[in-house]
């Protein structure tokens, strides 16, 4: 899979920009840009750029091809798990909705057409290991998101059972905050909260088993869900990518340590060496950090989905 031109920001005349996130640009698709046989409803074009964020700050340097790799990992998992949960993808090709004069090759592997859904205003996180913010919470309270855990767990230790730990959905530049299930119920209602929790854990278990067969541990992951006009629940946005998940090589896993991961850890480690306040604007990245980070994303894509990057 040759990497296409690096894309830091997408601008598509004729498609109204709905949202520009840390990585994805989302556009409304006017009805006159849809194929004549498109089912009734509203649709979005979601573009995965090559932007990179760390510590909730979008950095000035992109990772070449990252958006394509993220999009392909997501699409792989959306199709792999559609027997477990419907997703936001629809059968409309990207080139059918792009404005005139836009090179389809630039967007073919980094964009998807999706249903327009009402987002559930909570991040749905599944954890199988005690690491990251969960490890910090556990050290302080013996709990993660209000869930009591056994005493004496070490950093990165596998939990007795996967747990559901929701968080707030922060705006770009702000920080998500872990909340307990009762707080989620107050936000979205008991019935929807239970559906999201059950779907999150069901998908996590399936994906963790699948990844383990390929020598990868899925430590934790974050999902986003949305509902349609009839209240049907869909998984949306991205799915089980190195940006939304913590993947570890099984042969390098050791409880009591912070295992290496298939993500932007090289970037975070480099930034921690700088005198930087973790606020915008972010610092520039050295070429070797960019190259090593890209290689980690490419390795994850190949090992999980069997797709090689040239």
Curated annotation (Swiss-Prot):
GO annotation, cellular component aspect: cytoplasm
A GO biological-process term: 'de novo' IMP biosynthetic process
Pathway annotation: Purine metabolism; IMP biosynthesis via de novo pathway; 5-amino-1-(5-phospho-D-ribosyl)imidazole-4-carboxamide from 5-amino-1-(5-phospho-D-ribosyl)imidazole-4-carboxylate: step 1/2
Keywords: ATP-binding, Ligase, Nucleotide-binding, Purine biosynthesis
EC code: 6.3.2.6
GO molecular function annotation: ATP binding; phosphoribosylaminoimidazolesuccinocarboxamide synthase activity
Alphabetical list of SUPFAM superfamilies matching this protein: SAICAR synthase-like
UniProt superkingdom: Bacteria
Catalytic activity annotation: 5-amino-1-(5-phospho-D-ribosyl)imidazole-4-carboxylate + L-aspartate + ATP = (2S)-2-[5-amino-1-(5-phospho-beta-D-ribosyl)imidazole-4-carboxamido]succinate + ADP + phosphate + 2 H(+)
Family: Belongs to the SAICAR synthetase family.
HAMAP family: SAICAR_synth
Name of the protein this chain belongs to: Phosphoribosylaminoimidazole-succinocarboxamide synthase
Taxonomy of the source species: Bacteria, Pseudomonadati, Pseudomonadota, Gammaproteobacteria, Lysobacterales
Gene this chain is encoded by: purC
């Amino acid at each position: 899979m040759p990497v296409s031109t690096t894309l830091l920001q997408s601008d598509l005349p004729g498609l109204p920009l709905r949202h520009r996130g840390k990585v994805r640009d989302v556009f409304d698709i006017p009805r006159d840009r849809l194929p004549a046989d498109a089912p009734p409803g509203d649709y979005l074009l979601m573009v995965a750029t090559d932007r990179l964020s760390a510590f909730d700050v979008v950095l000035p340097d992109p990772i070449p091809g990252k958006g394509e790799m993220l999009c392909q990992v997501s699409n792989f998992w959306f199709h792999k798990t559609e027997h477990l949960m419907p997703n936001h993808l629809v059968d409309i090709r990207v080139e059918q909705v792009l404005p005139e004069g836009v090179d389809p090759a630039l967007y073919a592997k980094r964009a998807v057409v999706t249903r327009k859904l009402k987002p559930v205003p909570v991040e749905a996180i599944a954890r199988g290991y005690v690491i990251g913010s969960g490890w910090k919470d556990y050290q302080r309270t013996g709990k993660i998101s209000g869930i009591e855990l056994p005493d004496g767990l070490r950093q990165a230790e596998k939990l007795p059972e996967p747990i559901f730990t929701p968080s707030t959905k922060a705006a770009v530049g702000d920080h998500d905050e872990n909340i307990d299930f009762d707080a989620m119920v107050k936000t979205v209602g008991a019935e929807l909260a239970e559906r999201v929790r059950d779907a999150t854990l069901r998908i996590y278990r399936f994906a963790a088993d699948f990844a383990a067969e390929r020598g990868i541990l899925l430590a934790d992951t974050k999902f986003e869900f949305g509902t349609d006009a009839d209240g049907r629940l869909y998984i949306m946005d991205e799915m089980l990518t190195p940006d939304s998940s913590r993947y570890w090589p099984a042969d390098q896993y050791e409880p009591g340590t912070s295992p290496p991961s298939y993500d932007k850890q090289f970037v975070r480690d480099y930034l921690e060496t700088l005198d930087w306040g973790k606020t915008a604007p972010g610092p520039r990245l050295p070429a070797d950090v960019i190259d090593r980070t890209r290689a980690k994303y490419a390795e994850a894509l190949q090992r999980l989905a069997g797709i090689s990057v040239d």
